[in-house]
Amino acid sequence: MSIKRIKFNIPGFDALVPEGVPESDLILLTGFAGTGKTVFGLHFLVSSPEPGIFVSFEESLDQIRETAETFGWDLKKMEDENKLRLVKYDPFRIEDIMDIIQNSIKEINARRIVIDSVSALGMHIGHKNDIRIMMQQLNNLIRKNKCTGIVISEIPNIREGISRFGIEEFVTDGIILL
């Protein structure tokens, strides 16, 4: 049985991973502040003909649209065509985020998801065990719906390692370090 693989359609990156990543994988995209994690996530969504979802726990939807505009990406048009769903969510109300993501997947038949960021979300969850459970639930949701996902995590300047909480890399299927 062959594994379906998903290309990112990002020049330079696809040369590093020429076959793409396995469909339904959850990839950790991590790096220091200002390394282009949000832009990478947006590029992953806008460069694909498949519908996608961008979930933001920090930036407003207007900020996300403005960032995309600087690269010539018309997110509003994609939203109007049901090729993209932007979701701004308050991390203080985490209990129903999985339902919101599930409903968004069904509404536009999404195949790609970007969560920006697990760092912001995790700071409101607090306990590492709860963060790990939430990450596993997200991974299960993505697999169940045959989506391919990116979760963004910021590396704090004072931390050694590749993620904020030190657990994200153990719950995801692959890591991209910017």
Each model region followed by its residue ranges:
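P-loop NTPase motor core
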Residues: 96-171, 175
